[in-house]
Design a protein with these regions (language model features):
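A flexible loop/linker signature enriched in serine peptidases of the S9 family
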Residues: 33-43, 66-72, 91-100, 126-132, ...
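Non-catalytic accessory segments flanking enzyme active sites
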Residues: 18-21, 32-33, 42, 133, ...
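Short glycine-enriched nucleophile-adjacent loop
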Residues: 502-509
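Beta-propeller blade signature
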Residues: 45-48, 157-162, 205-213, 262-265, ...
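A short helix->beta-strand "capping" segment at the edge of beta-propeller domains
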Residues: 1-19, 58-63
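Beta-propeller domains
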Residues: 31-63
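Cap/lid segment of the alpha/beta-hydrolase catalytic domain
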Residues: 372, 376-491, 498
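Conserved beta-propeller blade repeats
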Residues: 14-28, 65-89, 128-144, 173-190, ...
Length: 509
């Protein structure tokens, strides 16, 4: 039976802020918040680590709107660093697509209200039709390094932090696309990812390394990992990251799974990559946007978000090849960041909505600050159950099945969901949009059709040459599986999806 008071549509959709990109800065935690009540404006907030009762300070008040439009999808509109007691922010404002800079002092104070802006925000670049994003701050040369997209071309550029209305200085011209910059701690080396048409970065990409001269120019660019466009079997790389010992870590999928590899010395290219943590699990996601993060150095080990059978977990990985799972209750993880035995991420689980997770790795403690107050009691929530079935071509396929509140039988209506992407994945974190239906007596099956990520490269490549066929067959097979199990009425089946999932939805009709 449906609930006596089903979840209202106004509660299920469009009211909860979306949190992104948390970052540890000394004893402070900064994050981005996209606000539905402000027409989707994104702003940056900061408060002291672990002090959930304190009021965060909004660093970028209205009308500032943090958004990058590189490759349309954008990502990483803000770069933040803390050096010698000064907080520095560089951001892209969607109002003019310009790069802006501001700095604060007062971080020794008791709370965020003690922060004092050194000066008003300074516009670093002039308005233009170009898009900027995905940057890092080069402290040694007091500049921002990032990507500019203009006239359909990507370039790596630099922008000085002490000048206004500049034209970005071009440092490197890739063949097609570039992103995911990583600057070594000494400022002497820069790594980034490139990919070429017609590949997406999760199909085939390369990790490029270059030296920075004293003047800040790039020299001696080398491809050091990934797949060449001419190779029949693509290799994808994800999130290059420097470790304190000067080694470089990246996720790549030549094994069939996005696993982590470490290069012991980026200065000695004759040394070999070390695959220290082989596993039939994923440690990366499809790179739709800049700024994605699934790994972070916690001061002692590499902390990694790992996807296993559609669920995410945290592991601590030692440079000796050891691995241990971090005990915490959340199985949907994104935007991982860590420092000095602490970690933050955006997380949820089947009964807890999206929020900011803070972890004290030394003590093994955690706390979670939801983006919004709980909209449902735990006993009112339908928890997703793993469903494996024979999909297109008889291949084993995954979905999350949410039974209607009160239980399912052969007369229950069923909603099939086809996610976007198509390289995205159906996650298990609490979705009020799904609970809207289950609270009304509907079952919901959220299908990880062929082409979804989180299940290895072979699963992801099922859709190649078969988009509109494999995904359609998988969604239909999920519904038929539940009908055969007498969990759904064959005459009461609906399907929904947006973007790529909208195409699948229409193709199913």
């Amino acid at each position: 039976m449906p609930l006596q008071q089903p979840l209202p549509a106004t509660t299920a959709l469009g009211r909860t802020p979306v949190l992104r990109a948390p970052q540890l800065l000394g004893d402070w935690v900064l994050w981005l918040e996209q606000r539905p009540h402000e027409k989707g404006r994104t702003t940056a907030l900061i408060r002291r680590w672990w002090e959930t009762d304190s009021t965060p300070l909004e660093l970028t008040p209205a009308p500032i709107n943090l958004r990058s439009r590189v490759h349309d999808y954008g990502g990483a509109p803000l770069t933040a660093t803390l050096t010698e007691g000064t907080l520095q922010l560089v951001w892209v404002d969607d109002n003019d697509c310009c790069l802006w800079f501001q700095a604060w002092t007062g971080l020794n104070g008791a709370n965020a209200q003690s922060l004092q802006a050194i000066a008003s925000p300074q516009r670093l670049t002039s308005p233009s039709d170009s898009a900027l994003g995905g940057g890092v701050i080069d402290h040694a040369r007091s500049r921002w390094l990032g990507v500019i997209e203009e006239a359909g071309c990507d370039r790596l550029v630099s922008v000085a932090l002490d000048q206004g209305h500049q034209t970005p200085v071009v440092m490197h011209q890739p063949a097609d696309f570039a992103g995911y910059l990583a600057l070594s701690s000494d400022g002497a080396q820069l790594a980034w990812v490139e990919w070429q048409q017609p590949s997406m970065p999760w199909d085939c990409s390369q990790l490029v390394l270059a030296r920075l001269t004293t003047s800040g120019a790039l020299e001696d660019c080398h491809v050091i990992a990934g797949g060449e466009p001419s190779q029949p079997q693509g290799i994808s790389v994800f999130q290059p990251q420097w470790l304190p010992d000067g080694s470089l870590v990246v996720a790549e999928d030549s094994s069939g799974w996005w696993n982590l590899m470490r290069h012991p010395s980026a200065e000695n290219l004759s040394s070999h990559w070390q695959r220290l943590w082989p596993m039939a699990k994923e440690t990366a996601m499809p790179q739709w946007v800049f700024g994605m993060s699934t790994t972070a150095w916690d001061g002692d080990k590499l902390l990694a978000a790992v996807c296993d059978q559609g669920e995410w977990q945290l592991q601590r990985l030692g440079l000796d090849g050891s691995a241990e799972r971090v005990d915490q209750p959340f199985n949907d993880l994104a935007d991982l960041n860590a420092s000095n035995g602490r970690a933050v991420a955006i997380t949820s689980n089947s009964t807890t909505g999206q929020g900011l997770l803070e972890l004290n790795l030394g003590l093994g403690t955690w706390q979670h600050t939801p983006a919004a107050a709980a909209a449902m009691e735990v006993n009112e929530i339908s928890v997703g159950q793993p469903l494996w079935f024979d999909g297109s071509g008889g291949q084993r396929t995954h979905a999350w099945y949410y039974p209607p509140i009160g239980g399912a039988d052969a007369s229950s209506p069923l909603l099939v969901k086809s996610h976007s992407g198509p390289s995205s994945m159906a996650r298990r974190g609490l979705s009020l949009a799904i609970q809207f239906w289950t609270s009304r007596g509907w079952g919901v099956v959220d299908v990880n059709y062929g082409g979804s990520t989180g299940f290895g490269r072979t699963y992801r490549e099922r859709l190649q040459g078969g988009w509109g066929v494999v995904d359609v067959n998988d969604c239909a097979a999920a519904a038929k599986t539940l009908i055969a199990a007498k969990h759904a009425d064959p005459n009461r089946i609906a399907i929904e999806g947006g973007s790529a999932g909208g195409f699948t939805t229409l193709a199913c009709l």
